[in-house]
């Protein structure tokens, strides 16, 4: 079976509703775990272990979804808002792709 980001968001909703540990987490309680996952990703990159890179990227994606869920419970923002904000930032930072501005070198295109 192939899963989607919507499945991940639904699983996070289920975990926040039904799992005592997940229910208890806050933005602050997840910080050290996020740092740990980031270091694990860096180690996997240093080893060029693509399987581990994939796994650690998944762990970080889980954290993005987790933080978004916690924020949505407090009516601040949700995962879709995070995606929209990122897309707007990428478009803004790449006018040489999304407008008439021309970048002559890679340095011209680096925000």
Segments from the language model and where they lie:
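Flexible "arm" and connector segments at domain edges
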Residues: 1-56, 62-111
């Amino acid at each position: 079976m192939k899963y989607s980001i919507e499945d991940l968001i639904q699983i996070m909703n289920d975990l926040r509703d039904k799992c005592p540990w997940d229910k208890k987490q806050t933005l602050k309680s997840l910080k050290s775990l996020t740092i740990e996952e980031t270091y694990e990703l860096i180690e996997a990159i240093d080893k060029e272990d693509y399987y581990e890179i994939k796994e650690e990227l998944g762990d970080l994606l889980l954290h993005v979804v987790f933080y978004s869920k916690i924020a949505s419970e407090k009516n601040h923002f949700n995962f879709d808002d995070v995606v929209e904000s990122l897309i707007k930032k990428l478009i803004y930072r790449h006018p040489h792709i999304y407008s008439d501005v021309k970048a002559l070198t890679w340095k011209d295109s680096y925000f």
